[in-house]
């Protein structure tokens, strides 16, 4: 039997033709793996990672049905219902009315947009990397609404609130997470 993470990798690559989507999936996967370890879910690292990898599985081919097409695609691949629920609720309030319940789902909701913002900020740096980025630099980019305008700050703020974290904590931890997976 193939592992969910292997199926996840194959689906992600098959259904994401654009490098950007593959890269985003891998960044969110690495970030989710980091948070699983950090928050005491060490036995679920692969599960959290696979959810991160698959969270936008329907976005590229069916952007109008984002979070609505995913359950069908994932069920066909034999992905379990917990994972499907997590994928669907990452779009809560945007393209889904399924609310994040589990801590893992709240982390995905909170860091999905934020990984995009950090990635965009990294590309502006001479190093093209987030490894030498400091929290104050990220906070400046976060406050500048024109920078990476497609990254919804309200979702990031709402995600921090869902988790019961200060915004700075979410920004800092997600930045640290991305430093661990940037080369993936």
Regions found by a protein language model. Give the residues of each.
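Electropositive phosphate-/nucleotide-binding environments in soluble metabolic enzymes
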Residues: 18-29, 64, 101, 132, ...
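A structured, mid-to-C-terminal "fold-capping" secondary-structure block
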Residues: 130-133, 137-184
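Alpha-helical phosphate/pyrophosphate-handling elements in metalloenzyme active cores
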Residues: 18-46, 60
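Single conserved hydrophobic/aromatic residue that forms the stacking wall/gate
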Residues: 1-8, 12
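An amphipathic alpha-helix signature
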Residues: 9-10, 29, 33, 71, ...
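Divalent metal-dependent catalytic cores for phosphoryl transfer on phosphate-bearing substrates
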Residues: 41-147, 157
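Structural signal for hydrophobic packing residues in well-ordered secondary-structure cores
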Residues: 16-17, 32, 36-39, 77, ...
């Amino acid at each position: 039997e193939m592992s969910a993470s292997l199926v996840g990798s194959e689906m992600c690559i098959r259904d994401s033709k654009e490098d950007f989507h593959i890269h985003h999936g891998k960044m969110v996967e690495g970030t989710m793996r980091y948070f699983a370890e950090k928050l005491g879910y060490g036995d679920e690292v692969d599960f959290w990672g696979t959810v991160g990898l698959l969270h936008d599985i329907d976005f590229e081919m069916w952007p109008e049905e984002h979070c609505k097409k995913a359950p069908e695609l994932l069920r066909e691949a034999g992905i379990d219902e917990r994972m499907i629920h997590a994928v669907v609720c990452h779009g809560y309030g945007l393209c889904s009315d399924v609310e994040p319940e589990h801590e893992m789902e709240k982390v995905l909701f909170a860091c999905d947009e934020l990984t995009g913002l950090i990635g965009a900020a990294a590309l502006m740096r001479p190093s093209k990397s987030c490894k030498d980025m400091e929290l104050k630099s990220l906070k400046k980019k976060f406050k500048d609404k024109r920078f990476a305008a497609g990254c919804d700050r309200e979702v990031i703020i709402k995600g921090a609130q869902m988790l019961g974290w200060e915004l700075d904590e979410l920004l800092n931890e997600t930045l640290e997470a991305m430093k661990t997976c940037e080369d993936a």
